[in-house]
Structures are given as C-alpha cells and as structure tokens.
C-alpha cells in the first residue's frame, strides 16, 4: 500500500514538472514575442525623427530580441563523438533562405571581416533590413517546415503559432531606410546579445490603490495636525510638493509621447496625401488616354464603315457593267449571224492552207516550218520573185539556137 502511494506521488511529481516546463516555455515565448512587438513599434517611431544606424539603441534592442527569438530552442550540432556543440541561427537561415530570389547568403558567406556564425547572422539581419526583405526571408524560412523541424526542438517560437505573428510584425520595417556599417563592433560574435527590458517596463497603479494611498495620506495628515506645532508642519508640505512634482513629470512625459506620436502621424498623413495626389493625377492621365483611344477608335470605325459602303457601291456598279456588256454582245451576235459564219469559214480555210503547205517536204529546207506567220510570208515573197523554178523548165541561152 505504501509502495502504491509512493508511485502515485512520483507520478504526480512528474506530471507537475511537465506542466511547469510547458508553462515556462509558453511564458518565454509570449515574453519574446511581446518584446519584439514593442521593439518594432519603438523602431518605427524613432525612424520618423532620425536615421536608424548601429548607434541607435532601439535598433540594438530589436536586433537582440530577433537574435534570441531565432535562437530559441535551437538544436546543437552533433559531433562525431556524439556530443552537441552550440550553433548559431545563421546555420538555419543559410539553409532555409536559399530559395529567396536574389538573396544575400553568398555575399555574407564571402565577407572577409566576418568569420563566426554569430557575426554572420548579425550581418544578415543588417543586410536584410537595408534590402527591405527581412520579412520575406523569415516567411520563406518558416514555410520550409521540414528544415525548421530539423534545426529546432519542440516548443520553439518558430514552430508555434507565434511564428506567423513574427512575420507579420517584421513587415512594417520595410518602410524604414536603414544605414549600417558592416565593419563595426555590432558584428562581434564573441558575446551573446542581451535584451534591455527597461524601455518597455511601465508600472500602472490601479485606481483603487491610488484612492487608498490618498486616504492614507489624509489620515496621516489629520493625525499629525492634532498635535502639530508651527515647527513640524514642514514634512507634509514637502510630501505634497513631491507628489505634485511627480504628477507634473508624468504629465510632461505623456505630453512628449503624444507630441512624438502626433509628429509621426502628421508625417504619415503627409506621405499618404502625396501618394493620394499622385494616384489621382495618374488616374486622370489614364482616363484621358482612355477617352483619346475611344475617340480614335470611333473615328477609325466610321472611316472603315465609309470605305465598306464605297466598296459595295463600286462592286454593284461593276456587276451592272458586266451584265450590260454581256447583253450587248448577245444582241450583236443575234443581229449579224452571217458575218460571224463567214469569219469562221475564212479562219478554217487559212488553217487548211497552212496545214497543206506544211506537208510539202521541198519547202522545209528553204523556209522552215510554215506553222508561223513569218514562214508563210517568206514563202509568198519567194514565189513572187520567181526564185523557185519548176523542175521541168529548161534553161536556154539566147545566143544558141538548135541546128
């Protein structure tokens, strides 16, 4: 019975340790994400009044927060002997961000003054901010879930729901123009980054607590006033003066913060107004171009319609002329049929004569083929000049007579 009770006690202790560990991990993740949100806001506010560089405390704090977020529950590198050596988040970024177009991974790997992995990771943060691609790098790395699981343990920020919040928070930094020197002391990878929580810590006293404090002061002042003399009236007045001074200081701080926010909002409003005016002017230009193109299209359409109508009229006139010429030729043929037959007979006789002359073998050597008009003309000229003699004709000399 005692052994069972001891076993139950040990089991409850194990469950309590697990729940405590889960709570601590959740609190750690929530703290880092909250501080990251505050650091991004302060960085955006500060960028409205001055250029952000390595000397800016807001940037140094943001870089420390981001470095700790990316190093949260990062697995060690297993050596040949089975031991785990600590590694930097740069080893994860170098593998997971290879798919980013025009990435700066190779250029950071080839930097001469940066040797350690931690220094390369810090250089990557600065280069990504100057390129305005830090959110894109983080989003691409988080989408590669297989690589992320290989580098981080369970309970890491990059494996939880806070990862999507991180990518969304970093998107606002694309509006800031950063200026960093990649040879400064900020790239020293000897010591880990430390977060300064003091700018984000603010104690707010509840209204009940304030009223109870005022009641205590009143009771304390009334008890002292009963047996007080003119000599011991000083301390309550001093306390009252200090309280008014603190209130005035708090009001001044609130006024200064409100003034800075007002300046930031005015600058943002001016930027949006400029963008709106540019968009309106571009819209007017585009509308004018659309109207001009519509007018040109209408004119072109009217011209094409006029050309089509004119071509149709010409086609109709040509068709009527062809029909009229056909009717005229038919009427001429019906009025003079003998002339056409006589012409046909003459043509047939000429063809017959040409064929007969062509069959004579004695003329082929002299005049060639009589199928052409030129050969026929040469033959007729020879006949007229008596150049062709008959084979029965005798050649006699005029001076010789038969005896």
From Swiss-Prot:
Record-linked InterPro entries: Run_dom, Run_dom_sf, RUN_RUNDC3B, RUNDC3A_B
A Pfam family the protein falls into: RUN
Coiled-coil stretches: 296-321
Ranges of biased composition (kind: Polar residues): 220-231
Superkingdom of origin: Eukaryota
Sites of Phosphoserine modification: 211-212
Transmembrane segments: none
Location of region: Disordered: 1-20, 207-232
Coiled coil as UniProt keyword: yes
Keywords: Coiled coil, Methylation, Phosphoprotein
Residues bearing PTM Omega-N-methylarginine: 13
SMART domains: RUN (SM00593)
UniProt entry tagged with the keyword Coiled coil: yes
Chain ranges of the RUN domain: 53-185
Recorded family membership: Belongs to the RUNDC3 family.
Subunit structure: Interacts with RAP2A.
Protein name: RUN domain-containing protein 3B
Organism per entry: Rattus norvegicus (Rat)
Higher taxonomy: Eukaryota, Metazoa, Chordata, Craniata, Vertebrata
């Amino acid at each position: 019975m005692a052994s069972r009770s001891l076993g139950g006690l040990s089991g409850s202790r194990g469950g309590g340790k697990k729940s405590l560990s889960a709570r601590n991990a959740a609190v750690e993740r929530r703290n880092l994400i909250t501080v990251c949100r505050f650091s991004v806001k302060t960085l955006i506010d500060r960028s409205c009044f001055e250029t952000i560089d390595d000397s800016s405390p807001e940037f140094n704090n943001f870089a420390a927060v981001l470095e700790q977020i990316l190093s949260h529950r990062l697995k060690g590198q297993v050596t040949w002997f089975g031991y785990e050596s600590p590694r930097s988040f740069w080893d994860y970024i170098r593998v997971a961000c290879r798919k980013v177009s025009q990435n700066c991974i190779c250029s950071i790997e080839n930097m001469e003054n940066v040797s350690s992995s931690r220094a390369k990771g810090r250089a990557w943060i600065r280069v990504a901010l100057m390129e305005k691609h830090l959110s894109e790098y983080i989003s691409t790395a988080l989408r590669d879930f297989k690589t992320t699981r290989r580098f981080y343990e369970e309970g890491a920020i990059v494996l939880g729901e806070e990862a999507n919040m991180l990518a969304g928070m970093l998107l606002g930094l694309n509006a800031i123009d950063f200026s960093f020197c990649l040879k400064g002391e900020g790239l020293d990878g000897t010591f880990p980054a430390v977060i300064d929580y003091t700018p984000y810590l603010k104690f707010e006293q509840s209204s009940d607590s304030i009223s109870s404090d005022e009641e205590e002061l009143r009771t304390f002042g009334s008890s002292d006033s009963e047996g007080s003399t003119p000599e011991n009236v000083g301390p309550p007045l001093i306390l009252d003066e200090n309280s008014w001074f603190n209130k005035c200081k708090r009001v001044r701080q609130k006024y200064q913060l409100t003034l800075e926010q007002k300046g930031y909002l005015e600058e943002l409003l001016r930027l949006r107004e400029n963008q709106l005016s540019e968009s309106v002017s571009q819209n007017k230009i585009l509308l004018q171009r659309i109207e001009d193109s519509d007018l040109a299209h209408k004119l072109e359409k009217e011209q094409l319609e006029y050309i089509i109508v004119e071509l149709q009229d010409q086609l109709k006139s040509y068709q009527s002329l062809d029909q009229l010429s056909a009717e005229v030729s038919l009427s001429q043929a019906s009025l003079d049929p003998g002339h056409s037959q006589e012409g046909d007979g003459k043509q047939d006789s000429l063809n017959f004569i040409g064929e007969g002359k062509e069959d004579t073998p004695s003329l082929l050597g002299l005049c060639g083929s009589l199928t052409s008009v030129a050969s026929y003309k040469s033959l007729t000229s020879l006949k007229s000049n008596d150049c062709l003699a008959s084979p029965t004709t005798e050649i006699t000399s005029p001076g010789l007579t038969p005896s």
